């Protein structure tokens, strides 16, 4: 049944991408939008497309849509993995402190004035902050070679609260313009996303998603319980650590 759903979802995604590219301050008909996509893919060269429309769709809107798709896919897969690991439909990557760590990294880059110098500084600082936050949570939650689920959740809440407090402190010290810049980033604004951002995150996110999907069978086994998992030769603790690391990297790249 799932193999029938996947093609339908892919078709819907393509349709949504075309519609999203057609919507904006400058109206571009859906047919022209589809023609521009086909033209830039090198399938067929439509001569009726104006250069201004081509620039609007290909250079401005398409990078934003692709970034949105990549980030959405990364967070969706990460969330599904977290829900499978914790056997809780409310679980999400945020319990690892990744979002708070990324926020602290971003506001640090803004406060130091680095975000305005290069588009790479804020994503870099946000990714480093997210991974450091996840690492601290792992260290606090580790008990020997095991990572108890309850301890992991409590450690994530504690680290998120602490990093959130530091972020608020920095926000109170920087300029109003820098605060607005951080707030725009924190709500997931895509208006300034360009092909450079796509090139920066596309390959890492796709690789991480493929690796996470490859753990689908192990996740299904973990849902049965630790004893059942061990009986079929699966090491629950090792598998959880690998999954948590991949989720942290995937989420860090997405939120940055």
Annotated model-derived regions:
Residues 1-256:
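Alpha-helical transmembrane segments in inner-membrane proteins
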């Amino acid at each position: 049944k799932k193999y029938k759903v996947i093609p339908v979802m892919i078709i819907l995604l393509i349709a949504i991408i075309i519609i999203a590219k057609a919507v904006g301050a400058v109206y571009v008909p859906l047919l022209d939008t589809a023609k521009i996509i086909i033209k830039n893919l090198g399938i067929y060269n439509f001569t009726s497309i104006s250069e201004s429309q081509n620039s609007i769709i290909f250079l401005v809107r398409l990078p934003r849509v692709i970034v949105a798709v990549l980030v959405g896919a990364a967070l969706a897969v990460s969330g599904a993995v977290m829900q499978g690991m914790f056997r809780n439909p409310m679980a999400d990557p945020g319990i690892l402190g990744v979002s708070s760590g990324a926020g602290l990294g971003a506001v640090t880059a803004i406060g130091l004035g680095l975000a305005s110098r290069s588009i790479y500084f804020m994503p870099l600082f946000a990714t480093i902050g997210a991974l450091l936050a996840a690492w601290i949570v792992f260290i606090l939650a580790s008990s020997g070679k095991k990572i108890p689920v309850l301890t992991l959740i409590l450690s994530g809440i504690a680290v998120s609260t602490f990093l959130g407090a530091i972020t608020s402190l920095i926000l109170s010290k920087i300029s109003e313009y820098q605060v607005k810049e951080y707030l725009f980033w924190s709500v997931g604004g895509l208006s300034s996303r360009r092909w450079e951002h796509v090139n920066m995150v596309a390959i890492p996110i796709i690789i991480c998603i493929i690796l996470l999907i490859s753990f689908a069978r192990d996740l299904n086994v973990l849902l049965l319980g630790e004893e059942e998992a061990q009986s079929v030769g699966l090491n629950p603790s090792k598998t959880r650590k690998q999954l948590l690391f991949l989720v942290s990297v995937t989420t860090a790249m997405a939120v940055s």
